[in-house]
Amino acid sequence: MGSTGTAVARLAFMTELLRPLRGIVGPPVPIVPFHNWDYYYITQNLTWDPDTADKENYESVTAPRYFVTDLASIPEPFWSALPPTGPYSYPAIIHDWMYWTQPHARSGDDDRAYADGVLKLAMAELKVPALKAVAIYEAVRAFGAGAWAGNADARGGGEKRVLKRVPTDARTTWAEWKQNLDNFA
């Protein structure tokens, strides 16, 4: 393939990767940002139910109202292609809840693989473009162990992620809010 053909192929790949999703199916993602826009809380329960074909291997997952999430934990250098918010936000919130609570804690990496599998299925069910879904899934499989362990350590150290009350001042940061344990359920 000549240089023109290579350029056209790259352009087609990038066009597909960056194509906005239209016609997303499912509930809206009800989120409110903290001041720095690095953490958010959801304003109602969010539930993922596996499709019929997946019910044998996966259970429904519900992230509760006022759960605090960072949405998709995508490093800043990749934001032009995969911003932290996108059609994958709903699956990312469910995934964050599972990484926080680690509800299927059975034996090491299998637990994380289960949560990552839920993310993959939820993105497919919400018709996240395939290239974006694959990039996100492969990244969490390759690099998610640190977040999994960090969440277990934070929970063990007393950190909470479900709010009892929400900030009333738009200048409130997550770093400030999480210092007061009275803010949590």
List the model feature ranges, each with a label.
Residues G2-A185:
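Extended terminal accessory/targeting regions
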